[in-house]
């Protein structure tokens, strides 16, 4: 009797981030389910999509979520690059009722410009930085700390996530765990 529906609107991802298992595990990005299939009369949904913004089907489902008035949490995070590079997406997301935060990822300094642009686009659409939550992948502690401090200075909510590979060969360092606990 969980108060929120849980499910995937899409599966897969268009990106091939070297640290991510999603493309290997789920394959190419594709539609998976209609929000009404698992909302089942509830008003809240925790959505586990990995790159819903890169999918036409996913964007249609977000429009439907808005029409239904459902509150959502894209728990795996949204791709800030999609928001930065497609201005209408920021406007679309500004009309969503969020359960708590709009979640995104800031996994490396390579996406710094896109992250900053996504934050600015969302702010222009009326979203407050305090409602913007960012997963921060921790591989190199100093680099992750710089990204955390940058997000904090922008008024956003960073969440440090120590990296571990899927073969078990790489485990987070003690410093990475300390950073995560501190953050």
Each model region followed by its residue ranges:
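Local cysteine-cluster metal-coordination motifs and their immediate loop/turn environment
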Residues: 8-23
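Alpha-helical protein-protein interaction elements
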Residues: 11, 66, 98, 173-174
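Short helix-capping segments at alpha-helix termini
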Residues: 125-127
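Glycine-rich beta-alpha loop elements in corrinoid/cobalamin-binding modules
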Residues: 1-6
């Amino acid at each position: 009797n969980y108060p929120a529906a849980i499910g995937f609107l899409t599966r897969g991802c268009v990106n091939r981030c070297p640290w991510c298992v999603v493309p290997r595990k789920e394959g190419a990005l594709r539609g998976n389910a209609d929000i009404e299939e698992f909302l089942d009369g509830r008003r809240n949904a925790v959505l586990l999509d990995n790159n819903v913004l890169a999918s036409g089907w996913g964007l249609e489902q977000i429009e439907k979520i808005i029409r239904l008035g459902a509150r959502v949490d894209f728990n795996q995070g949204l791709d800030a690059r999609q928001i930065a590079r497609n201005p209408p997406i920021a406007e679309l997301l500004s009309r969503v009722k969020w359960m708590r935060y709009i979640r995104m990822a800031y996994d490396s300094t390579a996406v710094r410009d896109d992250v900053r642009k996504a934050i600015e686009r969302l702010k222009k659409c009326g979203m407050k930085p305090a409602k913007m939550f960012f997963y921060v992948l921790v591989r190199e502690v100093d680099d992750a700390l710089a990204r955390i401090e940058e997000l904090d200075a922008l008024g956003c909510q960073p969440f440090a996530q120590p990296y571990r590979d899927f073969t078990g060969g790489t485990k987070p360092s003690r410093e990475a765990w300390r950073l995560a606990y501190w953050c």
